[in-house]
Amino acid sequence: MKRWWFNSMLFKKEFEHRCRLSKSMGSLGPIENASESKDPNRNDTDKNIQGWGGHDNYSNVDLFFGVKDIRNFFSDDTFLVKDSNGDSYSIYFDIENHIFEIANDHPFCSELESSFYRNSSDLNNGSKSKNPDHDRYMDDTQYTWNNHINSCIDSYLQYQICIDNYIVSGNDNSSNNNSSNENSSNENSSNENSSNENSSNDYISSSISSQSENSSQNEDITTSDQTIPESSTHMGVTQQYRHLWVQCENCYGLNYKKFFKSKMHLCEQCGYHLKMSSSDRIELLIDPGTWEPMDEDMVSLDPIEFHSEEEPYKNRIDSYQRNTGLTEAVQTGRGQLNGITVAIGVMDFQFMGGSMGSVVGEKITRLIEYATKEFLPLIIVCASGGARMQEGSVSLMQMAKISSALYDYQSNKKLFYVPILTSPTTGGVTASFGMLGDIIIAEPNAYIAFAGKRVIEQTLNKTVPEGSQAAEYLFQKGLFDLIVPRNPLKSVLSELFQLHTFFPLNQN
């Protein structure tokens, strides 16, 4: 936690506006730091209070204020302090009404002095009472009273100024240390000119400084919404600032979210292809102003009335619709790709993992039938975890239905179909239309499989080799034709379509 010197806080305008002083707030001289002392009782009886204005007679306050728990603070309290000249003053705190007053109320001070500092002169002169138990009681009383004053002052300053600095101080430890070192050097140079006043505040300075350091360490260990531990990884930072940054799944580097879309969701550090939403992919591939969606209002009716103990299926659908702005896990429609009219379907992994249910299967089937009727080239961007278990065998039937429509499109009409496999493409999508293309394209580092790694290992009790389900490894085995990064993808598709006699509409 950042350390604050008392004079620097008094110079802050926000502190001046929050506190109402009985004396005018003039300039304060430098606040000296002191070395460690062995006699806290003797030092505390000689605290110095500096004047608030040029005509006041208060002496210097040499306190190094730290940070403590505000729960230990009393909202309305009056304290007694005594300067090196023997003059007594009362300090009044009222945190509820924002009052901080210093008064020279001699009757009140005399009464408190008789109660708490009765034997202070005897202690300073080295004399002892005839009753040892009474001496120990007075020592304990004075020690407790001084600690109470320090605690309340610390807590008040924490409440007024430092309460909003948790995150900043947690992230700027190095700058805080430098600032603390500079303050210490300035205070030490000032102490050389005021060495006769240092001994009266050794205990308070060292005590509160220690408390501040302990508080700082505890805050670094505590995990909360406002405090970031020193040992936190990029993952923890990303969770807290995910509205600003996107973390790479490969190198764990942070990418500024504002520019992430313009970078095609590619990591700036390692070039890794991160997941894209269906809307971003449509914007990437389709010419502006040419997108015409199809079957947008088609939604699932829960065909097998699937119910879960955690959350009903219909409620989950409604939740994903609110979060993604989509009605289902695929968007279908027509548009132009570099002037070439195409039919395109784009799956969205953010909607229930891109799982294929009855609506997804029906929308893709209708898209294929439309492309067959209009003699259009077909693109389907795959991003799915497979068939949707909440719809049982109905979801499995979509594999056969889509494959049947593709057979008519490719074999009977001799039209051109290009699937684009992105990460992840698994399950029923891989086993059906994902691998039925005339030219199969995959993105770099895409995870492509029928059964996932965890399922295979649990079923066969064997370890799946690392990278055996990555696009580069599968390409060497001949599972698809091209691995194309996102940057040239649109140009590659345009060349393929023209090679298969699909030309732009405006071309003569």
Curated annotation (Swiss-Prot):
In what ranges is there compositional bias, type Basic and acidic residues? 35-47
Which residues are Zn(2+)-binding? Answer: C248, C251, C267, C270
Q: Where is this region: Disordered?
A: 30-51, 173-234
Q: What class of enzyme is it?
A: transferase
The prosthetic group or cofactor this protein requires is: Zn(2+)
> What GO terms fall under cellular component here?
acetyl-CoA carboxylase complex; chloroplast stroma
**Location in or out of the cell:** Plastid, Chloroplast stroma
Its pathway is:
Lipid metabolism; malonyl-CoA biosynthesis; malonyl-CoA from acetyl-CoA: step 1/1
Low complexity compositional bias, start-end? 173-219
- Tell me what reaction this enzyme catalyses: N(6)-carboxybiotinyl-L-lysyl-[protein] + acetyl-CoA = N(6)-biotinyl-L-lysyl-[protein] + malonyl-CoA
Composition skew (Polar residues), residue ranges: 220-234
GO terms classed as biological process? fatty acid biosynthetic process; malonyl-CoA biosynthetic process
Q: Name one Pfam family in it.
A: Carboxyl_trans
**Enzyme Commission numbers on file:** 2.1.3.15
Q: Any keyword Nucleotide-binding?
A: yes
> Oligomeric state and partners?
Acetyl-CoA carboxylase is a heterohexamer composed of biotin carboxyl carrier protein, biotin carboxylase and 2 subunits each of ACCase subunit alpha and ACCase plastid-coded subunit beta (accD).
Q: What does this protein do?
A: Component of the acetyl coenzyme A carboxylase (ACC) complex. Biotin carboxylase (BC) catalyzes the carboxylation of biotin on its carrier protein (BCCP) and then the CO(2) group is transferred by the transcarboxylase to acetyl-CoA to form malonyl-CoA.
UniProt family annotation: Belongs to the AccD/PCCB family.
Q: What is this protein called?
A: Acetyl-coenzyme A carboxylase carboxyl transferase subunit beta, chloroplastic
Source species:
Lactuca sativa
User: What is the primary gene name for this protein?
Assistant: accD
